[in-house]
Amino acid sequence: MSRIKLFFATCALLSCSLHSFAQIDKNKIFNPVTTSVTSQSVAPDARAGGMGDVGAATDPDVASQYWNVAKYPFTISRAGVSLNYTPWLRKLVSDMNLAYLVGYYRIGEHSAVSTSLRYFSLGEVQTNYNSTGQGAALTVNPYEMSFDAGYSLMLSEKFSIGTAVRFIYSDLKADYTDDVTPGSAFAADLGAYYQDYVNIGQRECQLGLGLNISNIGSKISFGGDNNSYFIPTNLRLGASLMVPI
């Protein structure tokens, strides 16, 4: 009798052990982070893109809104406007592109306001069905866009900070119902920039240090989808040294 009890007790312990192992193994299942509106990570200007997507600490220019909004008080010009157009993956598709309009204005000698509008077109996409899963095929023109406004302030002759608020909108379908709607999100950028001049030999060089955290904000969700997706938050930390030739 005692052997039978011992047998059942052993089976019960093994069952508990296997159940615990199954729970632990389930928790270790690969669970990647899903990110939406990844077009926010595409470099909008040729200068930074040509240097390998650097811009947190480079010399301030009109496109600093995307890379580090805190750089604007150090710009030489009081105001600036730029329009950029970038064909995207042109060797694969012919109609994907990024358009970027940005501008800034320095208020006095120590602060600046800035704004930008970003539009990313994914071109024409052929679908098999409409949003209800039935009917004829549709031609979809999905796009993602964002609008932001920023303010930057020089705290000393060598250091400045800045922030920007952003509205992000993603329209990936051709037609919508009450349960299926475009996605939207709000985000903010925080930046800091340090600029000084150092002597290296007989040359006076410009040293720059920059920190920028972009797209700190809410997740984005689409109507009818129970899931919400992260937006691409990025941390940029850089240093630059301009040496006159």
Predicted regions mapped to residue ranges:
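Subset of outer-membrane beta-barrel
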Residues: 23-245
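Cleavable N-terminal export/targeting peptides
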Residues: 1-35
